[in-house]
Regions:
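N-terminal basic, amphipathic alpha-helical segments
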Residues: 1-138, 339, 343-350, 359, ...
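Short beta-strand
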Residues: 69-70, 395-400
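Short beta-strand "wing" residues that participate in macromolecule-binding interfaces
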Residues: 70, 173, 429-430
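Conserved core of the PLP fold type I
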Residues: 139, 143-279, 291-306, 377
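Residue-level detector of anion-binding/catalytic polar loops
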Residues: 201, 222, 282, 394, ...
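Hydrophobic residues in well-ordered beta-strands that form the structural core
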Residues: 204, 225, 283-285, 357, ...
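PLP-dependent aminotransferase class I/II
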Residues: 310-390, 396-397
Length: 469
């Protein structure tokens, strides 16, 4: 095993960068060979004279860069496949990579116990309706695959159906105000590309949706967090930050928010729109769980009728993550501008997937699927509350309707270090730090997926390390 030696003092660089560069330098000089195990987090922290948390961030960056492999339960090893040399990553790219490490772990699915996963179990999305939809049979005279790209805004029939659905939520739009996308993340990417300028300050939920933070960092934006309360954004902080920064955009998730699971109340939604008017803010509101929530839930878009609100919806959370289909609803000028962005960056969305989604909706199969999904969410929410109560882990607010709960941890716990330790035991946690848009550390917490909260292995782990109250 090689030993990593590093500086005790670091000039002109962050400690994370210094550790990263020291290890990469030893790998490049052949002093650490492919397959060789890196020192443990504790040993490396002592060698460099830094905290374990700093070492974890440096190791995460090495993994993201492909220089090091993480093997749960074993440690970190020099990658067997050395990446091709090229231009060094920009600081914006490095920040985005640091933010999306949790997404990478969710996609690779290396952990058996998935407390921090963003998705429900696959069984929740399976059933006869889904099976039939994914094996479409063409009717006489009907093509299985579209013969051309299709209109830039997406399948007209699905856009019409979405407009009807939005009307049920008291959001009155024409089909021309609906732009189809490859899911909510794709929609957010287009919005960021169009609206956000380098160096601009953007307001976001804190805690909030970490993939969005990555997109904003890539756009070289400055992020200013707005504290999330159980009943919605902290309105005093929103007004103060809007006035202080001159921000033009506030990205939020009003209902079943990720990661807290809590929803905005009607009085807060009204006041939110008043603040938006006062400070000339556009509100980008993502509503991924809309189809399993009451149509009468308070939505800023219904109060505003898409004057200041850009409304983002998706079928990926409630249908299948593999069927990447979502939409943007906004005023006509905004939709037209975003359609241009879509054509330049994507050409168009998938007419084939859009046709599948449309058929599911109009045949009634999607409605039947949603009924089962709502039942599963309700049962899992009750079970998760019971399980976390037995562990004496307080749940933030009254989460309902989505997949998540936000658990407060004892003040002495480092949630990132807890996540690292859990990974060594084959447990995926989602530490609160991943959902913090700012460099300052917030109170220790973690996001819990309600579908997995009742796992005995998670309970034993939390009790063993004393991470409960």
């Amino acid at each position: 095993m090689g030993t990593v030696y590093g500086p005790n003092r670091i000039n002109g660089r962050s400690r994370v960068e210094a550790i990263y560069e020291a290890i990469v330098g030893r790998i490049d000089r052949g002093l650490m060979r492919p397959g060789e195990r890196l020192p443990s987090i504790r040993a490396a922290a002592q060698t460099f004279g830094v905290s374990k948390n700093t070492t974890v961030e440096a190791y995460d960056r090495l993994v993201a860069a492909g220089r090091v492999e993480s093997r749960p339960g074993s440690g970190f090893y020099v990658s067997q496949h050395r990446p091709k040399r090229g231009e060094p990553p920009s600081p914006a790219s490095i920040e985005a990579v640091d933010i999306i490490w949790l997404l990478r772990e969710q996609l690779e699915k290396r952990y058996e116990v998935r407390i921090g996963d963003g998705r429900p179990p696959a069984a929740w999305m399976e059933g006869p309706e889904m099976a039939r939809a994914l094996r479409p049979v063409a009717r006489p005279g009907q093509r299985i695959l579209p013969e051309s790209y299709g209109p830039p805004a997406g399948l007209p029939a699905l856009r019409e159906r979405i407009a009807l659905t939005l009307a049920e939520r008291s959001i009155n739009v024409t089909p021309a105000q609906v732009l189809l996308t490859h899911g909510a993340n794709d929609a957010l990417d287009m919005i960021v590309r169009h609206f956000v300028e380098p160096g601009e300050t953007v307001l976001v939920d804190n805690p909030g949706y970490y993939p969005l933070f990555g997109k904003l960092h890539l756009a070289k934006a400055e992020l200013a967090g707005v504290r999330r309360n159980p009943d919605g954004p902290d309105l005093d902080e929103l007004a103060q930050r809007a006035a202080a920064t001159g921000a033009r955009l506030f990205f939020t998730q009003s209902l079943a928010q990720n990661p807290t699971g809590c929803s905005i109340t009607l009085p807060v939604a009204y006041r939110l729109m008043q603040i938006a008017d006062t400070h000339n803010l556009r509100i980008v509101d993502t509503d991924p769980f809309a189809d399993v929530l009451p149509a009468t839930s308070p939505r800023p878009a219904a109060l505003d009728q898409l004057d200041r609100v850009i409304y983002v919806g998706t079928f990926a959370k409630t249908l299948s993550a593999s069927l990447r289909c979502g939409y943007i609803a906004a005023d006509p000028d905004t939709v037209s501008a975003l359609a241009d962005v879509k054509m330049i960056t994507r050409t168009n969305s998938s007419g084939y997937i859009e046709q599948i989604v449309y058929d599911l909706i109009t045949s009634g199969r999607y409605r039947n699927h949603l009924k089962r999904l709502i039942d599963r969410i309700e049962v899992a929410t009750r079970t998760a509350h019971d399980s976390l109560s037995r562990l004496r882990l307080p749940v933030f607010g009254q989460p309902a309707g989505g997949f998540y709960m936000w658990c407060v941890l004892p003040s002495g716990i480092d949630d990132k270090e807890l996540s690292r330790t859990a990974a060594e035991h084959g447990i995926l946690l989602a530490p609160g730090a991943a959902f913090n848009p700012e460099a300052t550390a917030g109170p220790p917490a973690m996001r819990v997926n309600i579908a997995y909260a009742n796992d005995d292995r998670f309970a034993r782990f939390m009790r063993t390390i004393g991470a409960t109250f």
